[in-house]
Amino acid sequence: HYKKRKAQEKGLPEPTVTNEEYVEELKKGILDMGIKLLFSKVKSLLKKLKNKIFPKKKEDNQAVDTKSMEEPKVKAQPALRGVEPTEDSNIMNSINNVMDEIDFFEKELIENNNTPNVVPPTQSKKKNKNETVSGMDENFDNHPENYFKEEYYYDENDDMEVKVKKIGVTLKKFEPLKNGNVSETIKLIHLGNKDKKHIEAINNDIQIIKQELQAIYNELMNYTNGNKNIQQIFQQNILENDVLNQETEEEMEKQVEAITKQIEAEVDALAPKNKEEEEKEKEKEKEKEEKEKEEKEKEKEEKEKEEKEKEEKEEKEEEKK
């Protein structure tokens, strides 16, 4: 309807779109909306998780207010050469990098449909595509579910194809948090570019962070007076966007239902025209048959009249004789 109206305003011929094309475009729009909604939900969850792990102190807020806007930012990682970044800075950088990636892909989704061919700003250099990636192998594409519990060390220097796969697996790992299993949530946090020799240290860090997250989770569970159930408390403190998500899904369903009804109405609008044409043709045929019948009856009446007149004439002649 929008394209037709624009065409009429510009004096152009109205575009013709089939129902199949219309439904296909509708599906694409719903998928696009769902991806944007997922990005928004994940980003909000990461912000809340970061604020819980690294709460801002009042002194820090006051210090930030007194600083000039032009003052350079302090690096999260130590600048000394050979010094290993702290686990806090690793986690903070990991969350920030994921949020930057989400912002980038969200922007590319709006501005450019060829997102897989675009290099994100956090990717400073490319790796060899044939290089082995930790936690992934050649069967990943066919059986991603087997890698659900693997540790994925997200590297900003990964090849774009590998990075997209890791993002997909990372998004899947938000489901344990939604289900209340906070101990599994740590697996969605990447810990920077680590070599194999650091795996043992990373595992120790993971156990510590798991305990911290579990403590945060327990604190959230005891936040209210107990009048609300665990699921409501969890949603209010961590997953507030679930309500918005549900409302959006319901709204999307209503829109899809309305559009479906509109399509059916348009199809039905075409059907009555065919019925009217058929009825007109039937009426014409009926009128034709009635005319033919009337003509036959007239011919019959005329013949009968002629025969009657002939008989009367013959009777008169006989009487004269």
Swiss-Prot record:
Keywords: Cell membrane, Malaria, Membrane, Secreted. It comes from the Eukaryota. Residues 58-74, 273-321 have a biased composition (Basic and acidic residues). It is found in: Cell membrane; Parasitophorous vacuole lumen; Secreted. Residues 58-88, 113-141, 263-321 are annotated as: Disordered. Residues 113-122 have a biased composition (Low complexity). Not glycosylated. It is a peripheral membrane protein. GO terms for cellular component: extracellular region; plasma membrane. Forms a complex composed of MSP1, MSP6, MSP7, MSP9 and MSP3; within the complex, MSP6 and MSP9 mediate the binding to the host erythrocyte. Interacts with MSP1 subunits p19 and p42; the interaction is direct. Interacts with host SLC4A1/Band 3 protein (via the 5ABC region). MSP1 subunits p19 or p42, and MSP9 form a co-ligand complex that interacts with host SLC4A1/Band 3 protein. Belongs to the plasmodium ABRA family. During the asexual blood stage, involved in the sialic acid-independent (SAID) merozoite invasion of host erythrocytes by binding to host SLC4A1/Band 3 protein on the surface of the host erythrocyte. This is Merozoite surface protein 9.
